[in-house]
């Protein structure tokens, strides 16, 4: 191999924040179903702690052996609403606590899958799980939750959209940080290694390793070398850089799967920012030529970035999946925070950006007095974008009690901090209160 390429890879890791964001083991809990919830919870704990017992050790070994930082080790499980439905319990918080206990025993960072799939309607387990979300998330530390409220093939379940607005509001009143651990999806994927939205789909193997990479700093650094060049050159540069980043993800995923004796699933091609300086998706867009993210041209630059990352990634790895795009979480991206504070980026522009990237309105802090119906309407808008464009979209908004526009909230760690953003004060309540199902779009009929 060319020495220059080896040195380039070393520089990517040491100076440009290239890392493996997560090695996530997906574990099926279908064989843990039991009408006795205590037995089910014990089976869940036993299976997770057996299957993933070496996950942290292997992640640390790979980081040491290959010099590639592995930031998070995580587990995702079969949606708990499916597992707990057999129990007839009126409350599923004990299942969340079983997941939390397993995660703490393993020493992992997060466990995802306290989830329900209600895109076309509820079964009883879904209703029970959704009602328990605020309490379950407030009483656990490492559990992440998600609810899928729509899909291109099914339409949007507006009853669920209405309820999730109320859940977000209730959760914020218990502890606003719980909303950082909950995502509301349209077109949720079954092999997502990222949190808080990861769960293990029923079509997946008994256990599988999925990997998420992170390389905004690497892409920005590459673009600094082609200042003033045409957009063709910019796209090609991003594509070649994404190839290298994804190749590393595949290497780590394959090694981890082999050491853990489970199949290798996918590499998620998402560019995931962190609050660290130089690890920002917004700064890539500014390197392309925007004075500040949020101005006119932002959506076009982001569309090109997202597409070029995918093109480079699918050449590098034959198994790609998850969310695969550019994440634009406000609190986790220094450039996004600066743009919001400067007034050049607002929620409406972020919504436009979600049309061309993954995943949606992510880690956005909003005033604590925002009505539940307004939150539901934000969810409905994002779900509509996902449904019509046949892509995954999501909402992870955090109403912060007692705070208003212009103030800041601190989340800590990888979640960073966020300015409170303005939401439209005009009511959407009458529309949300209609309920029902928004039918699937005409182009969903593929058969």
From Swiss-Prot:
Q: Which domain of life is it from?
A: Bacteria
Task: Fetch the Gene3D superfamilies from UniProt.
Answer: 3.20.70.20
Looking up InterPro entries in the UniProt record yields:
UPF0210
- Name the cystine pairs: none
According to its UniProt record, which protein family does this protein belong to?
A: Belongs to the UPF0210 family.
Quaternary structure (record): Homodimer.
Question: Protein name, please?
Answer: UPF0210 protein LSL_0162
């Amino acid at each position: 191999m060319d020495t220059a390429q080896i040195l380039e890879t070393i520089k990517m890791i040491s100076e440009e924040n290239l890392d493996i964001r997560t090695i996530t083991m997906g574990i099926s809990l279908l064989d843990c179903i039991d009408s006795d919830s205590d037995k089910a919870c014990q089976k869940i704990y036993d299976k997770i702690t057996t299957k993933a017992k070496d996950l942290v050790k292997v992640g640390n070994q790979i980081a040491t052996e290959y010099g590639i930082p592995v930031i998070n080790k995580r587990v995702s499980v079969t949606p708990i609403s499916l597992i707990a439905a057999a129990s007839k319990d009126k409350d599923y918080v004990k299942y969340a606590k079983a997941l939390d206990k397993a995660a703490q025993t393993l020493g992992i960072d997060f466990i995802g899958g306290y989830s329900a799939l209600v895109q076309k309607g509820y079964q009883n387990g879904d209703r029970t799980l959704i009602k328990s979300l605020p309490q379950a998330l407030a009483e656990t530390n490492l559990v992440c939750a998600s609810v899928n409220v729509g899909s291109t093939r099914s339409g949007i379940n507006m009853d669920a959209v209405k309820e999730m607005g109320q859940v977000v509001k209730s959760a914020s009143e218990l502890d606003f940080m719980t909303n950082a651990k909950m995502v509301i999806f349209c077109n949720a994927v079954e092999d997502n290694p990222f949190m808080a939205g990861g769960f293990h789909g029923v079509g997946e193997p008994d256990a599988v390793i999925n990997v998420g990479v992170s390389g905004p700093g690497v892409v920005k650094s590459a673009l600094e070398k082609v200042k003033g060049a045409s957009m063709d050159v910019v796209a090609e540069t991003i594509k070649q850089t994404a190839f290298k980043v994804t190749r590393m993800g595949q290497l780590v995923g394959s090694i981890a799967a082999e050491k853990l004796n489970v199949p290798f699933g996918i590499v998620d091609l998402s560019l995931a920012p962190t609050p660290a300086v130089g690890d920002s998706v917004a700064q890539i867009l500014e390197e392309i030529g925007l004075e500040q993210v949020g101005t006119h041209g932002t959506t076009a630059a982001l569309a090109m970035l997202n597409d070029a990352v995918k093109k480079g990634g699918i050449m590098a790895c034959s198994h790609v999946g998850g969310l695969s795009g550019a994440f634009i979480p406000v609190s986790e991206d220094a450039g996004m925070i600066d743009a919001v504070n400067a007034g050049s980026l607002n929620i409406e522009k972020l919504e436009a950006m979600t049309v061309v990237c993954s995943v949606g309105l992510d880690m956005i802090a909003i005033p604590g007095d925002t009505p539940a119906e307004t939150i539901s309407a934000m969810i409905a808008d994002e779900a509509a974008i996902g449904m019509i464009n046949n892509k995954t979209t999501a909402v992870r908004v955090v109403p912060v009690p007692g705070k208003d526009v212009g103030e800041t909230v601190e989340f800590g760690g990888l979640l960073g901090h966020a300015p409170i953003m303005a939401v439209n004060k005009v009511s959407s309540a009458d529309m949300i209160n209609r309920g029902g199902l928004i039918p699937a779009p005409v182009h969903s009929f593929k058969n």
